[in-house]
């Protein structure tokens, strides 16, 4: 049997796989120790629709945060440029890894962290929301210092969705998944040769 080896240079798949493994272990620890709290029942469909829409809105908010300084400096708006790890042709494995990684992050930063802060530290809800968003933002510092500010905004949206849904991590996870999948599909053409993009547009 040949060992499973990730494609060379496939950062997206590698990072998502490591996220699922590490965050999955942390979540399991939180569940086993009871520090993460109990899973909330699923809310109404309207919250899921709102969460999916806010996933796309998050992309817009992060773009505005990055674009305004450039607009002020250059006098023109830049194009939306997702992280380079999203570039490439469509892969079902990458697609599933994006879903799994976003869900794993939400389990840790919302279910585990907010639940842990509330249950173990007995901190106020607003502090749990801020800390969860802050540490989620720091988790993306490898994208650059400015990305921390962008992810703080997204993190606040995820945390507020989690709280407003009564603690249902499924709602914040859907929002997170929709945001990442939007960026992934938006970037697919940018991973193709120029001739292919021109042919697809005709």
Tell what function each PLM region has:
Residues 21-22, 29, 64, 68, ...:
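A ubiquitous, low-specificity "background" feature that marks scattered single residues
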Residues 1-23:
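Cytosolic-side membrane-entry/anchor segment at the start of a transmembrane helix
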Residues 86-202:
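Transmembrane helix-loop-helix hairpins at the membrane interface
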Residues 22, 26, 53-62, 158, ...:
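Alpha-helical transmembrane segments of multipass membrane proteins
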Residues 5-7, 31-101, 114-120, 193-202:
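Juxtamembrane helix-loop-helix connectors linking adjacent transmembrane helices
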């Amino acid at each position: 049997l040949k060992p499973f080896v990730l494609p060379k240079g496939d950062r997206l798949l590698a990072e998502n796989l490591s996220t699922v493994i590490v965050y999955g272990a942390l979540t399991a620890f939180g569940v086993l120790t009871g520090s993460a709290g109990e899973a909330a029942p699923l809310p109404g469909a309207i919250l899921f629709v709102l969460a999916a829409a806010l996933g796309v809105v998050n992309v817009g908010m992060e773009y505005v945060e990055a674009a305004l300084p450039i607009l002020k400096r250059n006098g023109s708006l830049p194009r939306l440029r997702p992280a380079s790890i999203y570039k490439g042709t469509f892969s079902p494995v990458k697609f599933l890894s994006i879903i799994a990684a976003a869900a794993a992050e939400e389990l840790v930063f919302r279910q585990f962290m907010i639940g842990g802060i509330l249950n173990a530290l007995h901190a106020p809800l607003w502090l749990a929301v801020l800390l969860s968003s802050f540490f989620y933002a720091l988790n993306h510092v490898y994208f650059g210092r400015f990305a921390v500010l962008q992810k703080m905004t997204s993190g606040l949206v995820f945390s507020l969705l989690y709280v407003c849904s009564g603690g249902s991590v499924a709602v914040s996870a859907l929002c997170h998944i929709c945001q990442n999948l939007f960026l992934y599909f938006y970037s697919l053409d940018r991973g193709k040769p120029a001739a292919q993009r021109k042919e697809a547009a005709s």
